[in-house]
């Protein structure tokens, strides 16, 4: 869940932000507020900037040298994330919300530039540079929890400006537009723009079977704190803070799905609450990722919902 807390900056961060006084940053477990996590994390450095985080037959690869992106997430060596070579079409990234504050392209310091790297208490910690434009720093913490077989990702947004700001966290994960199914707990009638994408209702949730169109499409929805994606071999489930309809940033939403034109890629997006930050304050927001083998038919079913609910309980 999102927590508002005072900022403490490590010496490594100080090298990147000249005018900030060095302070000790709290431990990752203290930041997340989940010190009861049972970690079984194996972190391996693959090259100068890439790190593998392993737990059992699951492996996640993160590139600290290029925006701290998640490049890969596999179960039993089967990939779930888009591996497209084109810019802005692969991996999983993190932005600040609302988008209208920066429009396009994504803020380079968060999405493209190198992050510093630390490893502490079985957690891989990445710190971005401060954005020249927005004056935020992004911190990403990657760990695993063997209690529920999840990858625990905690994002922090740090206000290094001299003024009070309002901001929300935003995770964007790209998957191939192939034979996939996206579903979440929200009424079809509440998905906006109404009728833009072919959502159907079954078993009390909304379902979208990946399709193709000549234009880009994006919807907003007020979900119940989870978002799932099913393909022919895998089930990806994300669990995050459930928001009320008034919690998101202006013109944003708890759950968003973006489908790029043609049969290229789809973005699974979730956001946290729009939060006021005083100078040198930060917010933290945690997303748990679950990836399971699943060769059941790619279609809406009671069994699939039961599997998701068992995972996120």
Could you tell me what each predicted segment is?
Residues 19-22:
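Boundary at the C-terminal end of the N-terminal hydrophobic targeting segment
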Residues 29-31, 37-43, 99-148, 164-167, ...:
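Extended, loop-rich substrate-binding clefts of extracytoplasmic carbohydrate-active enzymes
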Residues 50-111:
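Acidic-aromatic substrate-binding/catalytic surfaces of carbohydrate-active enzymes
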């Amino acid at each position: 869940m999102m927590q508002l807390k005072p900022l403490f900056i490590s010496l490594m961060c100080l090298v990147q932000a000249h005018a900030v006084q060095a302070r000790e940053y709290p431990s990752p477990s203290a930041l997340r507020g989940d010190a009861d996590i049972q970690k079984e994390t194996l972190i391996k450095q693959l090259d100068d900037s890439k790190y593998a985080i392993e737990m059992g037959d699951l492996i996640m690869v993160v590139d600290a040298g290029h925006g701290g992106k998640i490049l890969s997430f596999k179960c039993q060596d089967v990939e779930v994330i888009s591996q497209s070579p084109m810019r802005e079409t692969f991996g999983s990234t993190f932005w600040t919300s609302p988008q209208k504050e920066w429009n396009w392209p994504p803020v380079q310091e968060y999405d493209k530039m190198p992050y510093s790297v630390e490893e502490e208490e079985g957690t891989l910690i990445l710190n971005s540079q401060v954005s020249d434009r927005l004056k935020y720093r992004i911190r990403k913490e990657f760990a695993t929890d063997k209690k529920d077989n999840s990858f625990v990702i905690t994002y922090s947004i740090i206000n290094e400006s001299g003024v009070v700001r309002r901001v929300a966290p935003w995770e964007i994960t790209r998957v191939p537009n192939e034979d996939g199914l996206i579903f979440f707990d929200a009424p079809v009638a509440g998905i906006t723009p109404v009728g833009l994408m072919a959502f159907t209702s079954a078993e009390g949730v909304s379902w979208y079977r990946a399709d193709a169109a000549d234009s880009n499409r994006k919807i907003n929805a007020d979900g119940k704190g989870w978002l799932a994606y099913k393909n022919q071999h895998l089930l990806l489930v994300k669990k995050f803070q459930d928001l009320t309809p008034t919690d998101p940033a202006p013109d944003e939403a708890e759950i968003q799905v973006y489908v790029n034109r043609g049969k290229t890629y789809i973005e699974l997006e979730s956001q946290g609450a729009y939060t006021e930050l005083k100078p040198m304050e930060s917010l933290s927001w945690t997303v748990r990722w679950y990836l399971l083998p699943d060769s059941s038919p790619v279609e809406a079913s009671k069994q699939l919902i039961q599997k998701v609910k068992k995972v996120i309980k």
